[in-house]
Amino acid sequence: QYFPVLSSGEEIATPVKKSQLPKSYITLDFSDKAMLKKFVQQLSSISDTIKSEIQTVQHTPSKATEDLLTITMTDGNKILVPLSEVAKKLPYYEKIKPQLTETSVVDMEAGIFSYRNS
């Protein structure tokens, strides 16, 4: 089941079928509704180019970063970025992407670097 999320970050309680989803959509996997809302609000400041390339967003906390997200892009690349820094760091993906020669993980948890996605 899919639950639509408004641009305000509010989740609609009525589920929709996959066949009812728009042509392009982002799958969001958050158990914490406050984090979901914060992500959606930060997403509003991200370019349409980057937004159109996002496939899924998952909350994947690490020992060092409780609010770490894993963002899977339509090209297969993955971006690791703290929720608190999405608006600040995610725009750098447009500059990094052309430099990637293979499917990669772009780690924005502390600084920004990339490595091959194994």
PLM region descriptions:
Residues Q1, Q55-K63, P98:
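Short linear motifs in intrinsically disordered
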Residues E11-P15, S62-D67:
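Short hydrophobic/aromatic-rich motifs at helix boundaries and adjacent loops
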Residues N77-S118:
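Extracytoplasmic/luminal low-complexity segments enriched in Pro/Gly and acidic/polar residues
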